[in-house]
Amino acid sequence: MAQEKMELDLEPDTSYGGTLRRSSSAPLIHGLSDLSQVFQPYTLRTRRNSTTIMSRHSLEEGLDMVNRETAHEREMQTAMQISQSWDESLSLSDSDFDKPEKLYSPKRIDFTPVSPAPSPTRGFGKMFVSSSGLPPSPVPSPRRFSRRSQSPVKCIRPSVLGPLKRKGEMETESQPKRLFQGTTNMLSPDAAQLSDLSSCSDILDGSSSSSGLSSDPLAKGSATAESPVACSNSCSSFILMDDLSPK
């Protein structure tokens, strides 16, 4: 019964112009012909931007490599220059040690003090350094004046106030001391004159008493012998008094 139903469905119907009737199992297809392609051919889709992205990546990598190479070359050149400069400086220093040092070499520096004997109070003298290497000239330039510091002994001046007296010091100590104060000759002139006068008066009194009382010629002779000495002393004392009296 089922097969008969299928056959009835497949029979062409003249009323619809020979078009196939849709069966329950077949899909609906409109305008189907022999030239019409049931399956569409597969079109190859090219990946967009795939080649451009790869080319860009390759270009960027190439530029990075070039930049890295140039930077590496620059670093190598700078390292070579630094090594050459170090080698040259070392060779120059070795040659300077080997050869005797010249006067005009800039490495020579002369440290010479201004004064041959620096003062003890101000420390060392000033140091002149010649940048050109030449020793400083002994004759000072007119702009620079080198002044030696005076010694502290010469700088000490006497006090204006003079010597001060200590406490308890007597004014008589300023006078020169006398070694022999017991004798009458070292006393003051007034005291000496008074002592001379007293001695003369004593001698005169003794001579008069001896001449009046004693009758011995020896006593008279001694009195007469002593009298001119006493007179001479008295005369000298009188002369001194006359000289000292105001005129």
Curated annotation (Swiss-Prot):
Molecular function GO labels: protein serine/threonine phosphatase inhibitor activity
Ranges where the record places region Disordered: 1-23, 82-104, 129-152, 158-177, 202-230
Ranges annotated as biased composition (Low complexity): 83-94, 202-216
Residue list for modification Phosphothreonine: 112
InterPro entries given in the database record: PBIR1/2/3 (IPR026716)
Omega-N-methylarginine found at: 122
Acetylation in keyword set: yes
Entry annotated with the keyword Acetylation: yes
Positions where N-acetylalanine occurs in the chain: 2
Leader sequence segment: none
Comp. bias regions, Basic and acidic residues: 166-176
Keywords carried by this UniProt record: Acetylation, Methylation, Phosphoprotein
Top-level taxon in the UniProt lineage: Eukaryota
Residue numbers of Phosphoserine PTMs: 25, 33, 50, 58, 115, 119, 137, 141
Alphabetical list of PANTHER family matching this protein: FAMILY WITH SEQUENCE SIMILARITY 122B ISOFORM X1 (PTHR22227), PABIR FAMILY MEMBER 2 (PTHR22227:SF1)
Family of the protein in this entry: Belongs to the FAM122 family.
Name of the protein this chain belongs to: PABIR family member 2
Organism encoding this protein: Homo sapiens (Human)
Lineage: Eukaryota, Metazoa, Chordata, Craniata, Vertebrata
Gene that encodes the chain: PABIR2
